[in-house]
UniProtKB/Swiss-Prot annotation:
The keyword DNA damage applies. The keyword Protein transport does not apply. NCBIfam families: mutS1, PRK05399.1. It comes from Coxiella burnetii (strain Dugway 5J108-111). Pfam families: MutS_I, MutS_II, MutS_III, MutS_IV, MutS_V. This is DNA mismatch repair protein MutS. GO terms for biological process: mismatch repair. ATP binds at residues 622-629. GO terms for cellular component: cytosol. One of its GO terms (molecular function) is mismatched DNA binding. Keywords: ATP-binding, DNA damage, DNA repair, DNA-binding, Nucleotide-binding. The gene is mutS. This protein is involved in the repair of mismatches in DNA. It is possible that it carries out the mismatch recognition step. This protein has a weak ATPase activity.
């Protein structure tokens, strides 16, 4: 049998297909780019191209179903009871899915069972708990571009957080994409920019990016006449993006969105700018392999609630510049740290659950019974949290948290009365509403569960009333409930008995009372289920009325959770409160790398960092593995921790205003873009030199190493000089070009430091201690020996090093700056006569050897 290889959904004429396939194809035509899960009995089936794609992605069997239009139909399916597992996998792969349910009764349908689309699941609009990562915001992002400006709108539908901003460069745009890491990204079909860092990218038609339409949609959503009250009217591109976003969410949700009741502008100047490279290099949310272990978030996240965990990551991803707000956070941490108040608060917070997403599902009317059970538990904890905060000396931050927690006594009592202690997962089969909550429901349940006792009582009652001792009450599927009397006593049957069936030895009757009971019992289960669903919807209505205070409560709990966690981390990890200053300074006493210290078995060597107006750049030298990169990263991480309001891994820290953190650490080929290691390095360096300011912290490691010695040295020298003299940024500049240490003699704001090491019996011992002044040796052979280079190779290298060091030695230990880049005009022998064999480093010797070879070749 030949499988149809092309989906017929693009054809207008479906007449050649079976009625059921015509129904499917009409639905599929409305959603050509989405996978359609089409309910058929106990399975969701996929057909044609959808089936082939799903079979590959989900590793399920591709088969065929009969014929339609003369061809076998490719088909794949999944059981309805396991569909959530398959949906989770598809969403994580960036796919979008349409769920098409049977809404008709197969027993009464004359043609195909009626079906309709009940859910559209896309990566950025999913709200089901099973499909979400509880530690990560699930963000939908829209970008609207006009020339070199970009409007950005983001929405986390699982919280209602709706944000917009405008950006004026592609570098800043990509930095935002890296920060937000949207689950789904929408751009116009006319966009020229191609961001590649989102899990799922979709192009939307240009007409969805209409400013006037956006204004109308947003005003309708927020039930306002204008957007003036939101303070966003100066962001027309972002408003247009928000309009497209709202259209898309309305399209996917097919329901009201009452939890989206506000929109906020993100001001770029409020936060430290951290570009994509810096986020990766500092391993803020994930390590360099893309995993969370050994990242800053991994170290800090001891939160008690999922929403606290997500908020902590938002804080890490967006450090603030407002020192007043940061001081408030720090003061709150100090209060929670005192007498270890954080411990008792944590014990209560861990019973809250994911209140933020539960409230969103209530708003979307997709909350499940266990969501309401968890909400009830959370509301029950609030009075204790209130009391715990009341007992503390509250600063402004903690007072706001307490005020926004709220007390929901009525809702708590309602949920206590309405929902059983341990409800089932879904409302579908009932058993959710507690006995005693609703009298009609109780009556229906009693009829269903206690019908046998009713029949016993009725039989006894009728025997006594009629004096017929052979009277029985029975039931069969055909005739239902009946009263049975023997033929011998049938003449004694009361007149109100209505004959229903005559058998050989008995007569069977029905009475009005029994008929009423029969109707009630036979329909009681379905009626009880319908009543239960009705009551459940009424509960959701009641909860939706309290949506805004519940959202405020969830936000307050998340903030309390993060501050509480920072207090616990400060106590456990020996962090101390930094001091904020209004003048330029980064002064860290006994600073430590928080993650390296945590994973090491040996004690970590703390080091000082001192940068100020007269000391803006440190040229850092020392051996590989000596700790240069760790030292630079720890300085950046301590700064970043302070700017999220955390305590820091240092004995003391003073920090002035910081606007940006840049890193140029490590590099690799970008084969996808056709860029070499050196090109990647120079692109990152260029971004720093174009964007750093006097208030920036810049980390640069081994600039220039990806090209020839003299090209690299020249570039490193020029970049360091530019940073120190033109930008005047705070900079840590690690290098193996010893010649760069000469900068300190000509530029007062440049200082030399090195990471110390000692040599013992041809082995190197790294002290990891920062010392003033330049390093006097690179220890390259010793590091190579530690790396496992064969001993014979090391011995050969040592012999070669001695040969290079002996004949070629410079006159001075540190050549003057103006001699570094002069062209060599003397012949080889003249140059040799000018050299002195005592003080050159191995690298200097090798460089001069290459120089002499070049001179010789020119002769």
């Amino acid at each position: 049998m030949e499988l149809q290889t092309k989906s017929p959904t693009t054809q207008n004429d479906f007449s050649q297909h079976t009625p059921m396939m015509r129904q499917y194809l009409r639905i599929k035509a409305e959603y050509p780019d989405l996978l359609v899960f089409y309910r058929m009995g106990d399975f969701y089936e996929l057909f044609y191209d959808d089936a082939k794609k799903a079979a590959k992605l989900l590793n399920i069997t591709l088969t065929a179903r009969g014929q339609s239009a003369g061809h076998a139909i490719p088909m794949a399916g999944v059981p309805y009871h396991a569909v959530e597992n398959y949906l989770t996998k598809l969403v994580r792969l960036g796919e979008s899915v349409v769920i098409c349910e049977q809404i008709g009764d197969p027993a009464t349908s004359k043609g195909p069972v009626a079906r309709e689309v009940t859910r559209i699941i896309t990566p950025g609009t999913v709200s089901d708990e099973a499909l979400l990562d509880e530690h990560r915001d699930n963000t939908l992002m829209v970008i609207h571009q006009e020339k070199d400006r970009f409007g950005i709108a983001t929405l986390d539908i699982t919280s209602g957080r709706f944000l917009i901003q405008e950006i004026i460069s592609e570098n800043a745009l990509f930095a935002e994409i890296e920060r937000i890491r949207p689950a789904e990204l929408l751009i116009s079909e006319e966009n020229s920019v191609h961001p590649l860092k989102a899990d799922s990218i979709k192009r939307r038609p240009p007409w969805e990016f209409d400013h006037a339409t956006a204004l109308t949609l947003l005003c309708q959503q927020f039930q306002t006449k204008s957007l003036d009250g939101f303070g966003i009217t100066h962001l027309p591109l972002a408003i247009t993006a928000a309009g497209c976003l709202l259209q898309y969410v309305n399209y996917t949700q097919k329901s009201a969105l009452p939890h989206i009741h506000s929109i906020q502008a993100e001001q770029n100047e409020e936060a430290l700018f951290i570009d994509a490279n810096t986020r990766r290099n500092l391993e803020l949310i994930t390590n360099l392999q893309g995993e969370e272990v050994h990242s800053l978030a991994w170290l800090l996240d001891h939160t008690a609630t999922p929403m606290g965990s997500r908020l902590l990551r938002r804080w890490i991803n967006r450090p603030l510049r407002d020192q007043i707000l940061l001081q408030q956070r720090q003061n709150a941490v100090s209060t929670l740290l005192e007498k270890r108040n954080y411990s008792e608060i944590y014990e209560n917070l861990r019973h809250i659950g994911d209140l933020e997403r539960i409230v969103a599902r209530i708003a979307l009317r997709s909350a499940r019974p266990r969501d309401l059970m968890q909400l009830r538990q959370a509301l029950g904890v609030l009075p204790t949290l209130h009391q715990q905060l009341t007992n503390l000396p509250l600063n402004k931050q903690l007072q706001e948290i307490k005020n926004n927690l709220g007390l929901f006594d009525e809702l708590f009592r309602l949920l206590q009365k309405a929902i059983i202690e341990n409800p089932p997962i879904v409302i579908r089969d009932g058993g959710v509403i507690a006995d005693g909550y609703d009298a009609p429901l109780d009556e229906l349940r009693n009829m269903s569960t206690n019908s046998h006792q009713f029949l016993i009582d009725l039989e006894q009652q009728e025997r006594e009333r009629t004096k017929i001792n052979t009277l029985k009450v029975g039931y069969n599927r055909i005739h239902g409930y009946y009263i049975e009397i023997s033929r011998a006593q049938a003449k004694q049957a009361p007149t109100e008995y209505i004959r229903r069936q005559t058998l050989k030895n008995v007569e069977r009757y029905i009475t009005p009372e029994l008929k009423i009971f029969e109707d009630k019992v036979l329909s009681s289960r379905s009626r009880a289920l319908a009543r239960e669903k009705e009551l459940y919807e009424q509960l959701l209505d009641t909860l939706i009325e309290k949506l805004i205070p519940l959202q405020q409560c969830a936000s307050a709990i998340a903030n309390l959770d993060v501050l509480n966690t920072l207090a616990e981390r400060a106590d456990t990890l020996n962090f101390n409160a930094p001091q904020f200053c209004d003048y330029p300074i980064i002064k860290i006493e006994a600073g430590r790398h928080p993650i390296v210290e945590n994973v090491m078995t040996d004690p970590f060597m703390p080091n000082d960092t001192h940068l100020d107006e007269k000391r803006r750049m440190l040229i850092i030298t020392g051996p590989n593995m000596g700790g240069k990169s760790t030292y630079m990263r720890q300085t950046a991480l301590i700064t970043l921790l302070a700017y999220i309001g955390s305590f820091v891994p240092a004995k003391n820290a003073q920090l002035g205003p910081i606007d940006r953190i840049f890193t140029r650490i490590g590099a690799a080929d970008d084969l996808a873009s056709g860029r070499s290691t050196f090109m990647v390095e120079m692109t990152e360096t260029a971004a720093i030199l174009h964007n750093a300011t006097e208030e920036s912290l810049v980390l640069m490691d081994e600039v220039g190493r990806g090209t020839s010695t003299f090209d690299g040295l020249s570039l490193a020298y020029a970049c360091a000089s530019y940073l120190a003299t033109k930008l005047k940024a705070f900079a840590l500049f690690a290098t193996h070009y010893f010649e760069l240490t000469a900068l300190a003699s000509t530029l007062p704001a440049v200082k030399n430091v090195h990471l110390d090491a000692v040599e013992h019996e041809e082995k190197i011992i790294f002290l990891h201690a920062l010392r003033e002044g330049p390093a006097n040796k690179s220890y390259g052979l010793q590091v190579a020996q530690l790396a496992g280079i064969p001993r014979s190779v090391i011995q050969h290298a040592r012999q070669k090093l001695e040969e290079l060091e002996n004949p070629v030695i410079s006159e001075t230990q540190q050549p003057q700056q103006n001699e570094l880049f002069l062209p060599i005009e003397n012949p080889v022998l003249t140059q040799l006569d000018k050299l002195n064999p005592d003080n050159l480093t191995p690298k200097q010797a090798l460089d001069i050897l290459y120089q002499l070879i070049q001179l010789r070749q020119q002769k």
